[in-house]
């Protein structure tokens, strides 16, 4: 893989357009500015992404470009971009449409960042500072989510095609174990405090808790997302609140106790994942079809209260939140955009 350095000027656009919510809430959309961070698309006209990740140690956002075969590393201090190229890609037919598959999963590890590639079913470790690839492993199914588990020094990889999770050694990236489930794995959240990994069964409308050491499923809770099932997931380790992404809303489950549903909030259509800031107890949910970012506060009882709904861009979803509460949103297959969308709170 080759690393290239690019420097783009991010186009900053203030969006104060009111969305169809209550007047007091709509007015608060003006408390955010939205800009685009341009990424090199090599003539493709758009960049398709799934997972992105934020590394608080370096301040970098890592964004795999599936159809480009590159991983973009954005310095959030100045939006400068470095590109790691030459990841494998291939063209496959999905639902009667041809799509390019390539690097899509990403997780921040200990000094390295793990990249999952759907084209060759590889998981590679890349140095978080030099951006040099260190080692790669392969599994015999298409990887989706990739997550580093610090307490066990493992990388867990969801493989929805065969309803499995593959557990890799974080150093060698050799597969240690294969866990098979009754549903299609989707999303992940590590709860180090309770020694659990939370995961959804997208086709069963269930959210599960798995013991990181024994690998046993400890609990299954109704996600109540409906026909589309649950997608992404995040956890507040202090409170035990689990945030579940449904296609048109976000829900809070009490995973610290019995998995009871505590609250939900409408977000607009096109939600795939969500981001949570434990420092401010704020949930951020990008909706790709609705082209908006929902910002909500979570109180000590798990109740969600709307702060703002911010107009973004068609396809903007799967956000990560930085230490400064800036939200970087990935771009999906919807619409055309060669870049990331960034929503920043306006300084008062």
Predicted regions and their residues:
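Bacterial N-terminal signal peptides that target proteins for export
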Residues: 1-9
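Bacterial N-terminal signal peptides
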Residues: 8-18
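Predominantly soluble domains enriched in secretory-pathway, periplasmic, or organellar proteins
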Residues: 12, 21-348
């Amino acid at each position: 893989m080759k690393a290239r350095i690019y420097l783009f000027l991010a186009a900053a656009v203030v969006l104060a357009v009111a969305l169809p919510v209550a007047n007091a809430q709509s007015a608060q959309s003006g408390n955010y500015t939205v800009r685009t961070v341009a990424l090199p698309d090599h003539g493709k006209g758009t960049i398709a992404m799934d997972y992105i990740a934020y590394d608080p140690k370096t301040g970098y956002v890592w964004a795999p470009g599936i159809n480009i075969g590159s991983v973009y590393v954005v310095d959030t201090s100045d939006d400068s971009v470095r590109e790691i190229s030459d990841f494998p890609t291939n063209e496959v037919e999905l639902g009667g449409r041809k799509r390019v598959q390539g690097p899509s999963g990403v997780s921040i590890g200990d000094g390295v960042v793990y990249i999952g590639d759907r084209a060759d079913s590889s998981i590679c470790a890349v140095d978080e500072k030099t951006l040099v690839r260190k080692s790669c492993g392969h599994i015999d199914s298409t990887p989706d989510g990739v997550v580093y588990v610090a307490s066990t020094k493992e990388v867990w990889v969801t493989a929805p095609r065969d309803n499995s999770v593959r557990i890799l050694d974080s150093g060698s990236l050799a597969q240690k174990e294969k866990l098979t489930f009754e549903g299609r794995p989707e999303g992940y959240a590590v709860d180090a405090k309770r020694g659990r990994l939370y995961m959804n069964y997208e086709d069963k409308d269930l959210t599960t808790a798995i013991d990181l050491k024994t690998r046993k499923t400890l609990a299954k809770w109704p996600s109540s997302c409906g026909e589309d099932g649950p997608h992404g997931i995040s956890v507040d380790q202090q409170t035990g609140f689990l945030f579940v992404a449904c296609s048109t809303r976000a829900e809070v489950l009490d995973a610290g106790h019995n998995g009871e549903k505590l609250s939900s909030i409408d977000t607009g259509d096109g939600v795939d994942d969500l981001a949570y800031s434990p420092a401010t107890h704020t949930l951020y949910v990008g909706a790709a079809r609705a082209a908006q970012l929902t910002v909500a506060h979570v109180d000590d009882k798990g109740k969600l209260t709307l702060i703002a709904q911010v107009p973004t861009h068609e396809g903007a979803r799967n956000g990560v939140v930085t230490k400064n509460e800036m939200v970087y949103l990935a771009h999906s297959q919807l619409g055309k955009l060669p870049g990331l969308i960034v929503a920043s709170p306006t300084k008062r």
